[in-house]
């Protein structure tokens, strides 16, 4: 039996999703910072993957899972890691079919979920083949290294992408807790993994944006839609039974301060953030302040700073999605994804507040960002020119964002051929 991994607060990435009616251009936009883990830095490059370069049999470098792939992949462009020791790690990409993905946003699920559905981790071989007690290697599931390679070149819409990813998760499992973004010119879907084999997905409403800062963030889920028309929700086939069988729906989450929060389940709706997610001191230092700052910028007329503010940097109930006050521009995205609490007492580069407050919370723009990729899928231009990848390589506060067409046969050599040196 694969033992549950300990719940940890993710140490990388910030995601901002913009529905087509919420964006200034009328396009869907998915943006994510890919941040290296503490103590390392992962440089990136930009490459076009031809169908002939796509493997037909895939083996993960990290988990050693092996998967046969379809024989009809399409061309796609990705911004993967340069260092080869951790596999492809495509991170963000768009296909010639105008489907885009960003993977992954590290999230955390609670111990109750992991006990009920443990992560599927690689178990190395033990002993010597042919001798007593030998136990062969057991591969792990799929993870950030694999997801875009296994999904993006085989789907024609965001919905198809969710379905394919869900099938892979249910069959092979996963060894880590992740959020995955899949979009097309009309829709944005956000998938969160629940334990080793379960998952939920929610569509971002067209007139809304969504903020995800390394937490399991979806705060409403409608089972009647997920098992009906699937207009806004999808999930693994046995999710409802899984929740009931392991009493997860009875979960009460510690409220901020003292006492307990409200019950998680109400008829056909659950709050996944309560049922599956975490609420810890680490979340309030590392995660919730980033959601607070993004929404503070996009809904500025609300009270965010007074003692009576509805949401504070440590609020657990900051909405997963909401309508912005004004249409969101690429400039807004660039600012937010490189931001460091400008205009607040929490800016580490600022002069407001105190030395303590300026280092209290984890900002979005940090020095271990490998790149920010915002993929804009436009509906008012020819399909061949619809996908634009806005990319900033390196630490956001000190770099500039530049646009690149994604539907290409090749990429500039100075971005394609980046070496570890």
Predicted feature descriptions by range:
Residues 148-155:
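Short, well-ordered beta-strand elements within core beta-sheets of diverse protein domains
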Residues 277-355, 362-364:
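Accessory, solvent-exposed terminal regions and/or long lumenal/extracellular loops of proteins
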Residues 8-144, 164-307:
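A contiguous strand-loop segment
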Residues 137-138, 151, 363:
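Hydrophobic alpha-helical scaffolding
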């Amino acid at each position: 039996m694969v033992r549950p991994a300990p719940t940890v607060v993710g140490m990388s990435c910030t995601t901002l999703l913009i529905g087509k009616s919420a964006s200034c251009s009328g396009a869907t936009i998915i943006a994510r910072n890919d941040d290296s883990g503490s103590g390392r830095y992962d440089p990136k490059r930009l490459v076009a993957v031809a169908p002939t370069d796509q493997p037909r049999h895939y083996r993960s470098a990290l988990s050693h899972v092996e998967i046969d792939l379809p024989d009809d992949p399409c061309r796609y462009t990705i911004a993967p890691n340069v260092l080869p020791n951790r596999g492809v790690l495509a991170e963000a990409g768009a296909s010639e079919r105008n489907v885009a993905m960003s993977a992954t946003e590290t999230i955390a699920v609670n111990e109750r979920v992991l006990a009920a559905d443990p992560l599927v981790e690689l178990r190395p071989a033990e002993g010597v083949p042919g001798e007593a007690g030998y136990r062969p290697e057991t591969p792990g599931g799929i993870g950030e290294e694999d997801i875009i390679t296994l999904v993006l070149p085989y789907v024609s819409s965001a919905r198809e992408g969710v379905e394919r990813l869900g099938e892979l998760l249910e069959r092979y499992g996963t060894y880590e807790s992740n959020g995955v973004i899949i979009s097309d010119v009309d829709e944005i879907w956000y998938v969160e993994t629940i334990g080793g084999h379960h998952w939920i997905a929610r569509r971002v409403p067209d007139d809304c944006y969504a903020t995800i800062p390394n937490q399991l963030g979806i705060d409403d889920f409608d089972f009647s839609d997920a098992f009906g028309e699937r207009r806004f929700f999808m999930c693994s086939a046995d999710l409802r039974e899984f929740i009931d069988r392991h009493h997860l729906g009875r979960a009460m989450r510690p409220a901020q301060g003292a006492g307990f929060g409200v019950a998680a389940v109400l008829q056909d709706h659950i709050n996944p953030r309560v049922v599956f997610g975490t609420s810890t001191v680490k979340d309030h230092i590392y995660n919730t302040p980033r959601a607070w700052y993004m929404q503070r910028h996009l809904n500025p007329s609300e009270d965010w700073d007074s003692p009576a503010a509805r949401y504070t940097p440590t609020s657990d109930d900051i909405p997963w999605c909401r309508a912005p006050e004004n249409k969101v521009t690429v400039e807004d995205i660039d600012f937010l994804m490189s931001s460091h609490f400008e205009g607040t007492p929490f800016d580490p580069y600022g002069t407001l507040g105190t030395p303590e407050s300026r280092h209290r919370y984890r900002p979005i723009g940090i020095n271990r960002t490998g790149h920010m990729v915002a993929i804009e899928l436009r509906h008012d231009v020819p399909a061949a020119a619809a996908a634009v990848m806005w990319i900033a390589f390196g630490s956001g506060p000190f770099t500039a964002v530049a646009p690149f067409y994604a539907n290409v046969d090749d990429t500039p050599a100075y971005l394609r051929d980046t070496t570890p040196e």
